[in-house]
Amino acid sequence: RPMIRHQTGPKDLVAVQSAYTAMDANADVHPFINDMAAAFAWADLVVCRSGALTVAELAAAGVASVLVPFPHAVDDHQRVNAEFLVRGNAGHCVIQRDLTVETLAQLLRQSRDQLLQQATAARALARPEAAQTVATICEELAA
């Protein structure tokens, strides 16, 4: 039986908790998750939006993902962000209007081997040295 950890925001907390309770789902619902690194480490699969920092964190954590880009993002940048992980075989992108119960259920039924392959691919895309690289370039330009 799947275990769910869901960040809702404070506005939707009670409604989401009630929905999971009604379904007898094994769900831990939070208005906000302070330690996202720990949450990603706990997860086999993350379903989320695809902001730039989120995509970078998914790669750094080495976790498989289903990315649902925010449909009103400027210049559709969240879809572009999601494609980075998709091209690297690290996740799936589902446009919000195409997200159905059936589509999500199919993605949630991926085998452990598939999830592990995606997680490994995500980790390979990570650039943990990026901040140091940018700092070095800035120092060189300033010199």
Language model regions located:
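Donor-nucleotide binding loops and adjacent catalytic segments primarily
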Residues: 1-48, 79-83, 92-104
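Residues in the short beta-alpha loop(s) of Rossmann-like NAD(P)-binding domains
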Residues: 8-11, 71, 128
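A donor-sugar binding/catalytic signature common to diverse glycosyltransferases
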Residues: 36-78
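Two-component system phosphotransfer/interaction surface
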Residues: 99-113, 135, 139
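A short, well-ordered alpha-helix in the C-terminal region of glycosyltransferases
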Residues: 114-128
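C-terminal alpha-helical cap of glycosyltransferases
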Residues: 127-143
